């Protein structure tokens, strides 16, 4: 079966339209309509993969700020912002540059008065990028690596990370007191739990130390005595003079993707905006939907937003969206159908790809390249397999981060 160029073009168009709809510029401007400074200084702190774009939009809207710090992922700073120190740091594992940038932010908010305002711009990735470790940095990096490899979901990971940090779980807002803190948040966690997005630096924490200890036991985390003691301590449950507004989420991403499908002649159905399971299981399931509905003579689209997980069993290269797509390839073999999945931030795992695309021809192409899907997935090497069959989705850094969207396209040929 020849590669389906029509489905690939449609997939690319849907990706562009959905990502454009959740870019932070307009979202930040919309949220700032509710921004009411107290009359004193206005200081800006932005953390996360979308931090630079959010800060750039905010300063453009406000005209100026009295100082600021941005900390974002390597390669995500796009230029200078007047009055703002723009820093890059490690993600998903925190590094010394992130620690240094966070120290700058904490120094910036020291000695504020009740007349001052901290504009805090937060997006996904902030848990790694915005960090003041309460344990040695090397140990925090090691614990983060354990969590990433364990298959723990983002809520479980952040419940642990809050207690090992001097800024997470509401502690950054405490550092800003008595100033007002106005937070604008791009949500990357299903259901938009404010205290879990980037580990909630400026909102009260709803998780408990009992939950943290249970998670550590569940995943058999190797912890020092100091780290164990911190997990047993509670985080701030009440904060004063803090306001928070969510301005982007996976629901908007799914809605935009569905609208793009409709404009291309597909009948779209949003299955869920809370997809949360093993990536390869999600891929097989979405592939089975294509197998069930193909051949009916209608152009159909099924969409799922959320964030899957990957249990590392090998030493290859890839990401959750690439694994999802690859797992669908054998299920849709021979069909006039495609499955693709993309991360809204433009990066999927430690790769330059945003996600992966497969269609009815991909399984045969993999065989021609002497690649077996099961073996590739066991080695977590979806990147190289998809690259061999032109199945990588490359967008570059988008400047936003509101989870992932996965799409099944079914052509009218069956």
Predicted regions and their residues:
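Short beta-strand segments
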Residues: 45-47, 69-72, 119-124, 183-189, ...
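A glycine- and small-aliphatic-rich helix-loop capping segment at beta-alpha/alpha-beta transitions
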Residues: 57-67, 81-86, 106, 110, ...
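Internal helix-turn-beta structural module
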Residues: 326-414
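Glycine-rich oxoanion-binding loops at beta->alpha junctions
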Residues: 72-115, 156, 160-161
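Active-site segments that bind and position negatively charged phosphate/pyrophosphate groups
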Residues: 265-341, 350
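Accessory alpha-helical/coil subdomains and C-terminal extensions
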Residues: 161, 179-182, 204-285, 289
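Internal gly/pro-rich beta-alpha loop/helix module
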Residues: 136-222
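An N-terminal, well-structured beta->alpha segment
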Residues: 1-45, 53-54
